[in-house]
């Protein structure tokens, strides 16, 4: 909004001219989302505690230490969604189609997550909305997003770029739409599975969003994209502002979500954040890089898949003491804080490997 209001005055005012730069607006987005989180956090937490007498239901078959979390309110993802959306609407170019498509997916998946959290709180169990129903809704929203991207682009690309190799890509044709839906839905649920300990998912999400802030900026810049031999996609640079806002809102949320957590982001936060990372990776044509930068989410999801299939195949045997993987280490006797910090370190390594693919070809 500010960008669009100040755009006619960029040549007459030094302050207005600053808003012409994506980097300036991105830095401002971090400051605004952090500030909004610090201000609204205590108010929202108090409100959620009033509404949720018992807080988020805790699994009885989980680590015993988790029973101390009983009574902690959920739906804290509302804080992240509101601060990110407000900063984006304030600072991004509102004539940019990618901003609106991404926000549509972000809010829609947040609504699905809210429905799930609401069902858990009202029914006082950790099951919530049926898994098949959630997947169906996620698939429909992802399909709408893919159709919007397909038919608002004059020359839609169905290429899947392979990182670390020069000019190596696969032409998926219209199957790319199916693949894109898989990326968005998969990313959403992968983040959801990772969000099982205080602060565990928040920092990796921030690292991934920060990585895609850089990727969006480079891909949307003709000079940098040509230099790095990346697919140039006009107007994606504005997504840098949105990604920066996500970084700030996640760090602001971490202030209240660090152990012992005052609030959980719930499915409201995890499903929406996972989806927006998937959407941005599809827009920037860095879907495979997302699986590297967000490698921690892939590892956590893989541990669940392996556990389920092995359990069924062996009629009751398990690979891990408990899945997702972070619970396995808790069952091994690791303190929650140690699991979280070590997983953060791993997420940094994944992010660096993913970003190195931009240059190493």
Swiss-Prot record:
Family: Belongs to the glycosyltransferase 4 family. MraY subfamily.
EC assignment: 2.7.8.13
PANTHER family xref list: PHOSPHO-N-ACETYLMURAMOYL-PENTAPEPTIDE-TRANSFERASE, PHOSPHO-N-ACETYLMURAMOYL-PENTAPEPTIDE-TRANSFERASE HOMOLOG
Location within or outside the cell: Cell inner membrane
Function: Catalyzes the initial step of the lipid cycle reactions in the biosynthesis of the cell wall peptidoglycan: transfers peptidoglycan precursor phospho-MurNAc-pentapeptide from UDP-MurNAc-pentapeptide onto the lipid carrier undecaprenyl phosphate, yielding undecaprenyl-pyrophosphoryl-MurNAc-pentapeptide, known as lipid I.
Gene: mraY
Required cofactor names: Mg(2+)
Natural source organism: Rickettsia canadensis (strain McKiel)
Name of the protein this chain belongs to: Phospho-N-acetylmuramoyl-pentapeptide-transferase
Ranges that cross the membrane: 28-48, 74-94, 99-119, 133-153, 168-188, 203-223, 236-256, 263-283, 288-308, 338-358
Presence of the UniProt keyword Cell wall biogenesis/degradation in the record: yes
Pathway: Cell wall biogenesis; peptidoglycan biosynthesis
